[in-house]
Swiss-Prot record:
Compositional bias ranges of the Basic and acidic residues kind: 445-482, 863-874
UniProt KW keywords: Cell outer membrane, Membrane, Signal, Transmembrane, Transmembrane beta strand
Domain Autotransporter: start-end pairs: 1618-1902
Entries under SMART domains matching the protein: Autotransporter (SM00869)
Gene: sca1
Organism phylogeny: Bacteria, Pseudomonadati, Pseudomonadota, Alphaproteobacteria, Rickettsiales
Sequence ranges of Polar residues compositional bias: 146-159, 168-197, 225-238, 423-439
Disulphide linkage map: none
Name this protein carries in UniProt: Putative surface cell antigen sca1
Residues spanning the signal sequence: 1-28
Cellular-component GO terms for this entry: cell outer membrane
Amino acid sequence: MNKLTEQHLLKKSRFLKYSLLASISVGAAIPFEGMAMSKEAFRIDLSNKLLNHVSQLNGYKDTTNNTPQQIGKVIVSEPKINTYTPSEIREMKISNKPKASNPLKDVPIEDHYKVVARSKSDVGTARKVRPITRCKTFAGIEKTEQSQNTYTPESTEQMPQKPEIIITASSPTVSPASNSFITAPNTPNTTLTSPEHYTTAPGTPSSTPATPYQSTSDSKPNDSLGANTPPNINTNSKAVRRLSFSSSGPQQQAVQSSSQVKSEVPPKPTFVPLPIKKSSTEIVAGMVSNISRVNEMIGIKLAEVTQAIDTTDKKDKERLQKLYTQLTSTQKTTEKLKSRAEEIETKIKIGENKDKIKKLEKELTSKNNKADRLFQKIEKIDIPANKVSIKSQETVPVTTASTEVSAFQAQQARINEARQGVFNKNKSSGGNARKSSAGTKREKKKQEAQKQLSEIKKQEKAIKTASDKAKEVAASAKKETSRTALRAMQDKMNGDSEQLNKIEENLKLLTPVVYNSSTGPTYKQSPKATPTIPLSHGVQRILGEQPEDEEGYLVPIKVQQQPYQEIEDPIPSHSKDIYEAKVSQYINYLNSIQPNQSNQAQIDSVIDGLATEMRKFSADQFSQKLGEIAHLASIKAYEGLFEKLYEIQQARILETQKVYEQAEISQSYAEYEENSRKSSIPVLSRSSSAKSVISSNFEEKSALLQTTTTDESLRSDNNWKNSAPYSSSPKLDKRGLEYLDLAGDAFVQNLKQPDTLTIETLGLITPTQNTTVAKSDSSRKNNVSGSISEIQQLQSEKMRTETLGVQDDLGLDLHYTPQETLTEKSTYLVSSKKKQGNIIKRAVSKVGSILQTNYAENRRRKRDGETSKQRTVDQEGEFGHAWGNENHKESSLSVVSGCIKKATQLISLLDAKRTAILQTTSPSQRRSVSLVLQEIENDYREAIKISQKLQQVLIRKPEDIKAYNAKAEKKLDAIKSRADKHFNNIETDVDVGFNPNGGNSHSMPTANMDILPKNLAVTPPTNVGSLYNSPQAQQFQEDHKNIIINDRSQGRLNLVDSTIVRELTDVDASIYNTAPPEVLKEAEALLDRSQGRLNLVDNTIKKGTQPLSNLSTIYESVSYENLASETIYKTEQPKPSISYTNTSKRKLPIPLFRSAELDKKLEYLDLEDKLLEVEEARIVKEKEAIAKLNQYQDPENLEFKRLAMEALDLSSKESQLKQKRKAIEAEFSLNEKSSSTDVSILRSYSIDDISGVLSDAESNLSRSPSVSGLEDLNNSNVMQLEELKSKHEKIANDYNKELELDTLNKEKIWLEGEIKHLDTEFKPKVTESKPVFSCSSSVGSINSFSNDDDLSSRDVVTPVDTLNIEINKDYVDTYIRVLSNKIQKIEEIQKIEELSGSSSRSEELNHIKEAMAYISNRIQDVEELDEKMLLAINAQLQEHDEKISSLLREEATDILAQLLLQEMLVSDGKSESTLPAGDEEQEDTEVSRQLSSLPALASSNESALALSDDREKECLALGDSSEDEESYDSGFEEEEETIGQLSDSDGDNLKITEVDTVIPLEQEAKKEMQTQISENAPTLNQAKVVNTIVNNMIRNRLDASMNMSNNMVAVGAGDEEESHIKRGLWMRGMYGTNNHGRVENMTGYRGTNKGATIGFDAEIDNNIVGIAYSNVHSVFKFKNSKNNDKELINSHVVSIYGQKELPKNFALQALVSASKNFIKDKTTYSYGDTKIKSNVKHRNHSYNAEALLHYNYLLQSKLVITPNIGLRYGKSRDGVYNETGVNVQEIALTMKENNILSGIVGTKVTVPLKDALKFNNLGLIFQGAVEHNFKEKTQRINRVVKIFDNTFKHNYLIPKQPKTSYNLGTGIIGSIKNTTISLDYNYYLNKHYRSHQGSVKLKVNL
């Protein structure tokens, strides 16, 4: 619709509207002039005019008015003042004419509109006249209405406004035709006023002369009417035509001057046409206003029609009722339209999206057009003319008389009064309507808020949908890594179970072999570094623990063992051949695919191809690729791959042995040794020491082979690979290195085959440089040394030495080597023949023990792998080894090795002597030396701790090594000196041995010394069985035998008592009574200790050839010195050297043992069986627990995350338990040492002999009391395992509950954090030519690295999956806003720099402006962007400076993260509006609930706000308001430091994250926030109120004591006086209210106080001293707060008071109190439309002291007047606090302090009363006091508030208290027996403060 058409329609509607209104107003405001006529004459004249008017409309001209300009216009003149006198009016002739017919009677209502519309063509000229204005003129007291025209030379267009319709009561008027008074019918007269006033057409004679006027407030100055009107004035004003009923020429009218003018109420604006370009909100508002106007018009019409129905006859009622029905239906329609429009307005305000808004705009436009059409129809409605009964009257000639004028004026005054009354009534009704509409608006706002909440919930659902998508992204990203990590954790947990199962199977298989073999050395395997798995950052966040380094190893920082790494071989390895590319493709495929049944066949083909290609690799390439696929070992589908690789590796060993000859190796070694000496490189010489190192290397290779060549070890070791080359000699080629690498493997394979166990493999080995070996058991260090030629000679004599008779040619010479170091002198001086015999002896005796020991040692190696430190064996002190990386040298560990050995010796010595003391002292003697034993025990534990620290220490600098070594040695020397002192004070026997009979006889069995050869020295076993066979243990077993049997028979599974376990196993029972993993560790420790006892029993069985009853025992004494030298910690002590000499073929005598001794030793076999049963039960329960654990393998599962964290710490716990086990093993080192002191085999024995011995042993074991104890121990372990099962079931239940509770909080926050973390952490840089507006998240497979590769040369597997996040259009909008903000900042910086003469930001500013210009030219609307445009813009922006890209990456990411954060905060803050005002508990709960999710949020926010650049930024921290009172700052110095950092720094230096907010904050919102901050500061010292209350309570106590004494004096001499009370206990409860007004700009408060005081005092000679404690709880609510802001104070007050009686009726009272107030502030700030809640906790310390001097004056009327005067000093100090809350980044308030010194003057009157009821000494108390402040010192406060990106600072000056305060009070006191009761009331007031307080006191005289 164009503008022309719109104006045309507007003119048309206005004409129809005001034509209708003019016709309606005929009977209400008819113009008159001259003498009034009668009513009948007026009606007749009006009927004639109407008839003429209708005839003119129908085309007939009126004879009385031929002017064409008057057609279609109605001139409604204002009522004029009558100029006729009363006498003239009375003389008028009044004639009664017949009633005229109504010309519109037969015209239907619908045709009225047509009739009026026909006059449109005849009134065109009338629209060019300026509209007249209307004014109200007052003549004296009477009010009249006048009209005038205003003409302007300029064309103006006046907007149409809503007409004002005033309904007045019926009043007499004057007809202009009849010049007589008439009375209108009883219908309300209607006066119409409008900006478009009635006018007279040009050239038309006016019916009234001009009248002076005064303009009203809604009119403009106009010209006069009548003759003064300029003719032919043509204007563009939109005047409304009037129908003129004037039929006569101009008439005279008297002029009445006006003296008063009263402005008229301005008319309401009419409907404004909608502009073409207006917002939807303005359109809706205009529509609602338009509908309201239409509805109001309909109401007016209804009122008129209703009145007309009541006053008309029956003929017209039917027509009027139809009209009434139409108006009613129209009104209902408009009401519906209005409600619909309001709903649309609400929806537009909420705003879902722009498309919906456009639809609503179209709908509103159509509704508005419909409303216009409806309004036009309403305007056309006309009230039938016949509703007014018009009676014709005769025309009376007009005469002038003063009396008639006065009467008319009086009549007019009554009319005006009536109109004014109606106007006032309408005005009051309008005011009520406005109030009701305001209430309606408030209700609508509430409804709107409810709708907004529903919309917010919808947005939250959208966020949840996005979270689900993020969950899918995270799940796909973690799919590969999580599975591997979980498998590794499970394998780590059940690794021990599988190892124990194998041990059990091997023991069962080796049972018949163990009994016919001798004890041989066990092989200690070198502990390996804990395998590590490189994980992605996503998995690390799931596990909740940061990695140790950038690669992200799945090992906790505290317990991660540094991997051992060989020094890199300078010899280049083989280059990668063509097969490596295929292998890499296969490996990538296996990493990316998810195994299932459908693709299993394809996986098998890939496995076959991979194995075929790897078969072609060299050793290095094979090991490297093997490390890359090690993480796949836990997947069942890939088991076949590792079986094939194992076969390939074994085949390579055999091939290598065939290829290389010994001569090549010897020649290579000789060249290497010579070159090394020339280059000053230390070389192992061909001596026994060198061979010891070589042998140790073979042990390491044995351990490596056992752990890396089995399918089971592949699952538990991800670094399964071959070791690095051993030699770095440039002359040693690749073949030699490989042969050296595999020679040890071949040696170990031979060791596993007892029938081929020879030493020929020693001829294949060469020394290695910098070889890392682990600590091995002492039993493994019996290594044969000699030259290579001697070793080769042994091979030819192998078959000759395999006979059993070779023992006749052997002689044994056992002695110990020095314990500190290994030197070349420590050799085995043996002949080749004796060496052969030693080898055969080991092969025959330990054929089964090797495998058993290897499995046990493999289990211990895995358990110790994370804590034990590998050492470099370096006899000459010149070998080093890389520790973790090349910067950490092993020299630190080599230096302190001497201290480790020294600590080990000291531990063994302490343990041996402690055991000796226990064995050589009786129970009665043991009590006397208990303190000494305790000191020894403490020293023993301290030595163990020092040894552990020495093993774990890692020092880089040599000077630090020496200092640490000296410090450790100093501690060890101190321990040794203390131990020697303790041992010297205890007298014990020198002989320590094994006494099977008990008592104090301690000697050791040995052979007959007379017949032993002189060159054979035998070190007998020491302390064997001392634990189980001590007198105390036997006595204990006998005492508890019956108890154990009963418990077992009744099925009771009792936990083992600590004393029982200590006596039976020498192990603390707390280990058994705790968690099952610790029980497992102790069971393993017992199993290890039992190994030595099995060897002892084995030797005993093999030696026993005579019947057990005939055995005898020979004992040999052993000194303490020998015992100490033999008791060496097993991991450090070398085995004794054995020297063989030719003793011809003499046989050794058979040692004799008692049968009882064998019985005791066989009990150890039972111990082994019972331990195996324990392990079986544990394995079953652990498998059940693991099955339970498998139920929680969902990566998003919270319980699984917790279990994953526990699994990470498993290695640390195992390490701790291992250390504890080692400490316990030290106590049994003597027993384990016995395995190395074997006596040579003298003769063979048969299986029948062994069977007989075993049957006897079983019968003895069945009677052994230790069996019962072990069964109970087993039962105890079963109970612990049952508890483990119940614990896992409880975890499942708790997890389900926790999952339900945290679904809407923790999961949402965590997942949102995941989204933003992926968005920020993986955001690419522009320098890498990646899109600026796109984010990518890549998840790589696990990167495995070889130990022999440097960190810089590790191969990283390419990512297998890349997930591109959809481009977001918000990036563009955000980018634009960031650039705009940055331009402003740079311009500000430039202004400052220009002043200083420097400008460094101009280049960056130019780049930013270029980017802005490009974006503004390319982008007109962000909504029109698509993905291609975004990419094009991105490519263009990359051409700009890198600073722009960095800017986007840093700030835009931050803003987008804050967008999500704001949505979360808004959704979380939705419950704020639901909190009822005044409900403190519910509000506290709600605030706590909102802020308790924020610690998660804290960690989730930290991820959401993480930035991609390298700059350090602090993340937004949302404080926890639920912390308890213990979190308060304790010291004022710390508080001052905190506020100093906050208040003295500017916005950039504040420790607050600078975040750009997306919420636009208007200036008004900022001002409002600043006002709130200035008003809500807690600076009015509310804590001072509490101190005043408490002081009043205690002062009343002192006054009560004084009153009682006065009452007793006033009672009279005839009354009996109570006994003198010396002590009193009293309590007082109080309740009070207070009110503080506004001070300056500080908000006042209202508060309540409630509390209690308890005190105790003593009275001595009328002098009182006492102490009291008060606890008061106060709540202060701030005034002028719509958010229920309040302050809670919990006060603890301690007071000391006293009263001293002075001469001459004087008394002195003193009071000192100190209070500690815990304050909580709860404040809500209104920041625009945002409500920000904050919570604060801080402390206040207050101190008060006062002294009062009283004088007691007793009157004759028994009244007591007590005036008093005194001083009071008060000090209050608030602590610093930091305030945090939702959307509040930080609020800080400095410490404030207030000191007041005041004086007190008052008096008190006591009125005694007669005794009533059971009360005596009754009295009334009236008191008053005036307190004046002499000096008050306050402190200025600095406050800093940071909300979003706006910082508010405010400085406060605490307002001083009023100088004068008043305290008034009254009370009543009385006593019953020894109890005193008083009621008190106090009223305290000053200029700003009022307080009421009531209390009840009860005192009991003790």
